[in-house]
Amino acid sequence: MPERKTLQRAARDKKQGKSASTQAGEFVREEIEHVREGKHGVRSTKQAVAIGLSKARRAGVDLPTPKKASASTRRKARQDSEAAHDGHAKSPTRARATTRALKRESARPASKSALSRHASKSASRRTAADRSAAAKKAAATKGAAGRSAAAKKAARTRAANRAAAHH
């Protein structure tokens, strides 16, 4: 069960009109914190992220099922989204079994270096078109003041890069 503060943060994100993946990010962060605190371990960074996303779906975050994922991942995602609405309590026996299994795993995949490796690997998989679309969406949802600040920062970065190239 997600902590109350995580649910509140996700609700606040939703109220502010932020995307489903931003809301789900709160659950992933909570999962990483749990591993760092030693509540349980994970086999890989990817697993920690997957657990966070699963919890988000079960808490009612409207995350779409991933198109490029394997059939079993898509099935699990669909199952989680349905579980948000079916009102069944989770069986304590199964919950205990999963926690015990995770307790045997390591905390290393939640370290700063592991997360950094995972993030750069994921980022390198994104296409230029994907990045461009994300930037356009960000500009559209930023508002005038935010846009002008972003433009100033971009101009400053361009100038700095130009200066660095001449040296």
Describe each region flagged by the PLM.
Residues 1-167:
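A charge-rich, low-complexity, intrinsically flexible signal that marks solvent-exposed coils, linkers
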